[in-house]
Amino acid sequence: MKPTVFIQANERQQLGAKISAHSYKRNSANPDAFDVRILHTRDFPRLMDPNQSVLRGGQVRQWDPDDLQSFTPLRFYPPQAMGFEGRAVVTDPDVFALGDIGELFARDLKGKAIWAVPRPGHNNRPDYIATSVMLLDCSKLRHWQFDDYLDGLFGHRFDYFDWIDLDREDPDTIGLLEPEWNDFDRLTPRTKLLHTTKRRTQPWKTGLPVDFTLQRSWPVNLLNRMLLRYLPHPDPNQEAFIYSLLAELVDSGEVTVDEVKREMAANHVRHDSLELIERYRGWDARMALAA
């Protein structure tokens, strides 16, 4: 089986996932050497059931299949999908390749099962590891049995954060990637994978009502969803980069104008997306970043 990039997605992030998938192939010197696969929550019935709850930060919270980030359990599915063989990269749908993912697949894993970018200080943790991008040696992750994990998650046998933050893994099996392989809202000539991780400023969402859950009580979350709006991203180059990729997808027919219109009508992407496609068609990220 070829090395595979797995991109998590749900209804709210499916267009972002398509843009992400395009970026990996587009910016690789050898795009036929690996596969790209989108993992959509709708194909996993247990993730679509709202009548269940999880432990999250020590508190019981209702599971919301419609949340912006309901795909995150799928970070732990790729080894099983690969038959516990070979290498996989798993990413969130708001991660876009500027560099060549083949470089990541080709690196010496030094016996480690998991490689990811450290993010010291995030969530008040000096040892935080970002699982939004992971390079995996699937042969060393046979304990990642996805159905068993979902049993444990929805059965409150472990805390969501302990799982998603890799606290249940042996730290000796985790290697640390360079920051450019999960560049958090930073686009520079060194960036390999751009991650538009600040949900409030995702470039394709500007002006829309927020559709994600904060770590607060449900009345506060409901009020936030009613009142809060996505803000413009502070770096216009990131907006340009993402919409230039979407323009290529539209021009190739992989994404239709009608699909973009449906996503706009559903408030999954900003309502001026067609104008931005025209504005940024042909925009060259490397030239812009070198200027």
Predicted segments with their positions:
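A glycosyltransferase accessory/donor-loop signature
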Residues: M1-P3, A9-R12, K18, V36-I38, ...
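Short, acidic, metal-binding catalytic loop of nucleotide-sugar glycosyltransferases
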Residues: S23-D32
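Residues that flank catalytic or metal-binding motifs in active/ligand-binding sites
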Residues: D32, R75, T91, I129-S132, ...
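Active-site-proximal specificity loops/subdomain of glycosyltransferases
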Residues: A33-A81
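GT-A fold catalytic core of metal-dependent nucleotide-sugar glycosyltransferases
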Residues: L74-R119, P126, L135-C138
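Conserved hydrophobic/aromatic beta-strand scaffold that supports enzyme active sites
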Residues: P78, I114, T131-L135, I174-L176, ...
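Conserved catalytic core of nucleotide-sugar-dependent glycosyltransferases
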Residues: A106-D165
